[in-house]
């Protein structure tokens, strides 16, 4: 149902996986030929399904877009870092900007969104459920304060093998957020 209020899109590549070539210096690079191929993949996806948004690559770590309907990016930060990061992203996000694009390509009218975010310590080991709740609220509050941020995708709904940043534990049991101390019955 393409009229659903949630955003559904085809994401062709995630975090440049398989798109970069290792050079003689050992560094990965995203070659112009590969960028052109990704653009053709975008065109094909739009041809096959014109009802959906298409994202060429959901970038992180210095990657970027070639041809996309969504100017998205991945970012995992502690709550206190979000304001400065989003201030910078908003300042660099406008038609004609090359921020978050590769090969000299420029942004058009694509909306900006964080397509992968969560609590950074979830990847290194849990600092505790209460800290998870604090950073989660700080992050979401900053997204709401920045009007150019059209949306976000939280990773993930439940804890998995090496990522402890879900809303609930891997066994789907509730996490203790400490909010029950403020509002009885709320975890």
What are these regions (language model features)?
Residues 1-173:
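Substrate-binding/catalytic cleft of secreted carbohydrate-active enzymes
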Residues 177-179:
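C-terminal domain-tail junction helix/linker
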Residues 181-187:
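Surface beta-strand/loop "capping" patches
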């Amino acid at each position: 149902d393409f009229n659903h209020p949630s955003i559904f899109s085809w994401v062709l590549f995630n975090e440049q996986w398989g798109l970069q070539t290792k050079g003689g210096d050992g560094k990965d690079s995203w070659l112009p030929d590969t960028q052109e191929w990704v653009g053709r993949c975008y065109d094909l996806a739009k041809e096959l399904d014109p009802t959906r948004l298409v994202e060429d690559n959901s970038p992180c770590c210095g990657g970027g877009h070639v041809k996309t309907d969504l100017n998205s990016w991945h970012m995992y930060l502690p709550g206190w870092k979000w304001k400065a990061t989003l201030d910078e992203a908003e300042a660099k996000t406008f038609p004609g900007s090359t921020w978050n694009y590769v090969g000299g390509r420029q942004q058009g009218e694509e909306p900006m969104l964080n397509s992968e975010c969560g609590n950074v310590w979830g990847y290194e080991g849990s600092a505790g459920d209460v800290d998870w709740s604090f950073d989660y609220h700080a992050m979401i509050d900053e997204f709401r304060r920045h009007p150019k941020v059209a949306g976000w995708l939280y990773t993930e709904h439940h804890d998995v093998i090496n990522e402890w940043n879900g809303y609930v534990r891997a066994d789907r049991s509730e996490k203790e957020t400490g909010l029950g101390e403020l509002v009885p019955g709320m975890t």
